[in-house]
């Protein structure tokens, strides 16, 4: 028998301690990983609801199990809110992750062995955009495009590659690109070679929802996103379209269920519904505007301190710092900043001489630090502290600078808690 007062703390102290330690880590570290964000207590409440117990194979009104009347309400709420948020005609809220959403799109639109054209992982793409270690590069014949030495997409190069390889599908989107993608140009290229245009907007979905980054839906046949990252919801996936082709919509439905997944995670769909409602609130646009302002403010500090920023700036929530000129590695920078309670991730940069697990750069993102309430002055100060640590790498005062920076970080974390009590 279960009772409502059962707790993990009483039952599994080792697990409970890990949870408490993670709570403390998040409160005491400044999070600058571009793909991470803080979900609201409302989102987490939905994830912990009794919808955890419910199996609901199928779609609203067409379930394979009984007792789904409330699951139908939840899923339809999420669908309707996502349609309103992004201006979509078709929405599927069931994908468990962004990668599974992408797999469903491939399965719906093309066949095994068909050619796809996507952004190279080393140039800012994603594993699922055709990387050879991913299903997208194993099941399909993937051809990759990259960026210029200036860190920008060369659309003429994309066009030439498309004309040469004649892909069935072109993937636009990124995991580490700080500029605005010309969705219309990508569609023009796709139309020229008779390919589908598939956009993965996972990193910028929150900015798009707020109207601060171009919406790909008017241009793409199909769009996917995660529901965390800039969007700030639970970890999950989403498929959208406004192409007007009912046949494509039917294929997408069946490619998610039953082709790629069984029962949907109704508790996560409930959390997605909460997230979409939050994103429709007026203050959400202000938050996303501050995300971009903070990223731009940090970029200026890094440049003033002599560090190269890929593409010389940012128009979204992230940017890449290159250490090629300084002879530093992303791995060393990541580790040193981590000791100072500043969390980033090492990242390859254009013409990177280092191996993928070492790299010559870091990726910095501002969704989480902005969610804490940090303003432009706060993040300028933070970027300066980061440069202090980077300047000290390999020098006698390295540990002293790290220790001093950590104290400053702890102070700002105390002033701006993630979840104020």
Swiss-Prot record:
Complexes and interactors: Homodimer.
Cited Pfam families: SHMT (PF00464)
Subcellular location: Cytoplasm
Class of this enzyme: transferase
Protein name: Serine hydroxymethyltransferase
InterPro entries assigned to the protein according to its UniProt record, in alphabetical order: PyrdxlP-dep_Trfase, PyrdxlP-dep_Trfase_major, PyrdxlP-dep_Trfase_small, Ser_HO-MeTrfase, Ser_HO-MeTrfase-like, Ser_HO-MeTrfase_PLP_BS, SHMT-like_dom
The UniProt record lists the keyword tRNA-binding: no
Keyword Cytoplasm annotated: yes
Binding site for (6S)-5,6,7,8-tetrahydrofolate: 121, 125-127
Pathway listed: One-carbon metabolism; tetrahydrofolate interconversion; Amino-acid biosynthesis; glycine biosynthesis; glycine from L-serine: step 1/1
Gene that encodes it: glyA
């Amino acid at each position: 028998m279960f009772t409502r007062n059962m707790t993990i703390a009483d039952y599994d102290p080792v697990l409970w301690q890990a949870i408490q330690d993670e709570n403390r880590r998040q409160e005491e570290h400044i999070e600058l990983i571009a793909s991470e964000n803080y979900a609201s207590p409302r989102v987490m409440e939905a994830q912990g609801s009794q919808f955890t117990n419910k199996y609901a194979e199928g779609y609203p009104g067409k379930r394979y199990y009984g007792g789904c009347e409330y699951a139908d309400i939840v899923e339809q709420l999420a669908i309707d809110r996502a349609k309103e948020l992004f201006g979509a005609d078709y929405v599927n809220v069931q994908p468990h992750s962004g990668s599974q959403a992408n797999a469903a799109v491939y399965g719906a639109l093309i066949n095994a062995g068909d050619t796809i054209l996507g952004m190279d992982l080393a140039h800012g793409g994603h594993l699922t955009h055709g990387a050879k270690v991913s299903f997208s590069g194993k099941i399909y014949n993937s051809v990759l495009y990259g960026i210029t030495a200036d860190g920008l997409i060369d659309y003429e190069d994309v066009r030439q590659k498309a004309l040469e390889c004649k892909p069935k599908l072109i993937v636009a989107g990124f995991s580490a690109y700080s500029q605005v993608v010309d969705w219309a140009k990508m569609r023009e290229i796709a139309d020229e070679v008779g390919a589908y245009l598939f956009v993965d907007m996972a990193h910028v979905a929150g900015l798009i929802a707020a109207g601060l980054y171009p919406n790909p839906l008017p241009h793409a046949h199909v769009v996917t996103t995660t529901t965390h990252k800039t969007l700030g919801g639970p970890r999950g996936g989403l498929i959208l379209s406004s192409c007007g082709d009912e046949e494509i919509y039917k294929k997408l439905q069946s490619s998610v269920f039953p082709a790629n997944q069984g029962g949907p995670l109704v508790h996560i769909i409930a959390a997605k519904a909460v997230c979409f409602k939050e994103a429709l609130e007026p203050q959400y646009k202000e938050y996303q505007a501050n995300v971009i302002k903070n990223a731009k403010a940090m970029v200026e500090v890094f440049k003033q301190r002599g560090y190269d920023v890929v593409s010389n700036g940012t128009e979204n929530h992230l940017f890449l710092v290159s250490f090629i000129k300084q002879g530093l590695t992303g791995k060393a920078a990541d580790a040193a900043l981590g000791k100072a309670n500043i969390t980033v991730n090492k990242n390859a940069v254009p013409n990177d001489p280092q191996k993928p697990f070492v790299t010559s750069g870091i990726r910095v993102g501002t969704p989480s630090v902005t969610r804490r309430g940090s303003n432009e002055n706060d993040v300028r100060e933070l970027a300066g502290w980061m440069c202090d640590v980077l300047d000290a790498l390999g020098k006698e005062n390295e540990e002293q600078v790290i220790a001093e920076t950590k104290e400053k970080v702890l102070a700002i974390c105390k002033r701006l808690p993630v979840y104020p009590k």
